[in-house]
């Protein structure tokens, strides 16, 4: 994983779209690592912004004997994100999915109240929810590349592997 952003950081929107684009069954991670190479049971990305900067991480469920290969592939994918950012197709799909999920969540009064309350608590303001869709829509391919370069640094990552105990 990598150091991430805070809730107030404007980079949050581009980084959330990178996370979304790397996390579903049509994502570059899933297609390459699981489907093409057969190295994983599941894979994706997590982006956890917080009051203080959080983290961005890739995760994979794999067999113990495939850990090194998976790690190499994840590093290659991070390098591709730094080099090119998301493709237009990936970015558009991520925007549609993320904005759609947020619109559905806003239909539930409890979820809406919780989001507005948390936005106020985090110092974003209760009206933040009304501006989010526009902020996601404004993210460009160049911005996804810029945030990947800024946050997915090869020399500033932490690798954590959890597996069975060795006898």
Predicted regions and their residues:
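Proteolytic maturation boundary segments
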Residues: 139-167
């Amino acid at each position: 994983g990598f150091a991430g952003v805070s809730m107030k950081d404007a980079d949050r929107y581009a980084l959330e779209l990178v996370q979304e684009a790397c996390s579903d069954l049509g994502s570059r991670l899933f297609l390459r690592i699981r489907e093409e190479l057969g190295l994983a049971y599941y894979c994706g990305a997590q982006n956890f912004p917080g009051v203080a900067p959080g983290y961005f991480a890739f995760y994979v469920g794999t067999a113990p004997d495939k850990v090194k290969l998976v790690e190499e592939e994840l590093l290659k994918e991070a390098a591709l994100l730094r080099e090119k950012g998301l493709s237009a197709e990936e970015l558009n799909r991520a925007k549609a999915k993320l904005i759609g999920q947020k619109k559905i969540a806003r239909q539930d009064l409890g979820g809406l109240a919780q989001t507005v309350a948390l936005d106020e608590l985090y110092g974003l303001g209760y009206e933040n929810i009304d501006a989010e869709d526009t902020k996601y829509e404004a993210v460009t391919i160049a911005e996804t590349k810029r945030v990947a370069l800024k946050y997915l640094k090869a020399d500033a990552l932490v690798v954590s592997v959890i597996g069975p105990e060795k006898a």
